[in-house]
From Swiss-Prot:
Details of cofactor binding: Binds 1 pyruvoyl group covalently per subunit.
GO biological process: alanine biosynthetic process; pantothenate biosynthetic process
GO cellular component terms given for this protein: cytosol
Post-translation changes: Is synthesized initially as an inactive proenzyme, which is activated by self-cleavage at a specific serine bond to produce a beta-subunit with a hydroxyl group at its C-terminus and an alpha-subunit with a pyruvoyl group at its N-terminus.
Pathway the protein contributes to: Cofactor biosynthesis; (R)-pantothenate biosynthesis; beta-alanine from L-aspartate: step 1/1
Domain of life assignment: Bacteria
Protein name, UniProt field: Aspartate 1-decarboxylase
Function: Catalyzes the pyruvoyl-dependent decarboxylation of aspartate to produce beta-alanine.
Cofactor annotation: pyruvate
Length: 121
């Protein structure tokens, strides 16, 4: 049996941009993508801590060191600049592998500075 498990998450990031007229996606600083193990164009869920909204989109790379978390396209109606969000990516795996799997969690402060090194959840 295959299970869908949390692969990684960027926890409590702060939205820095919201562009309703962009084609879609979430722009994330390349440093954070690498820290979490999220690839450009990978599907992610975005959970808005401020308003409870949840949506699925895909990650695109923002410039390294920019601390960017930009909500693009129609999803910009679901998150505003300053909102705190959680970005989650998932992976499918067999049950035996899932039992041994430790997702990566990157904790961020209100300025999108990493406050804890990536670790297993």
């Amino acid at each position: 049996m295959r299970l869908t498990m949390m692969k990684c998450k960027l926890h409590r990031a702060t939205v820095t941009q919201a562009d309703l007229h962009y084609e879609g996606s979430i722009s994330i600083d390349r440093d954070y993508l690498e820290a979490a193990g999220i690839l450009p164009h990978e599907q992610v869920d975005v959970l808005n801590i401020n308003n409870g909204e949840r949506f699925t989109t895909y990650a695109i790379e923002a410039p390294r060191g920019s601390r960017t978390f930009g909500i693009n396209g129609a999803a910009a109606r679901l998150a505003q600049v300053g909102d705190r969000i959680i970005v989650v990516a998932y992976a499918e795996m067999e049950a035996a592998e899932a039992e041994q799997h430790d997702p990566v969690v990157v904790l961020l402060d209100e300025h999108n500075k990493v406050i804890a090194k990536p670790q297993a959840a």
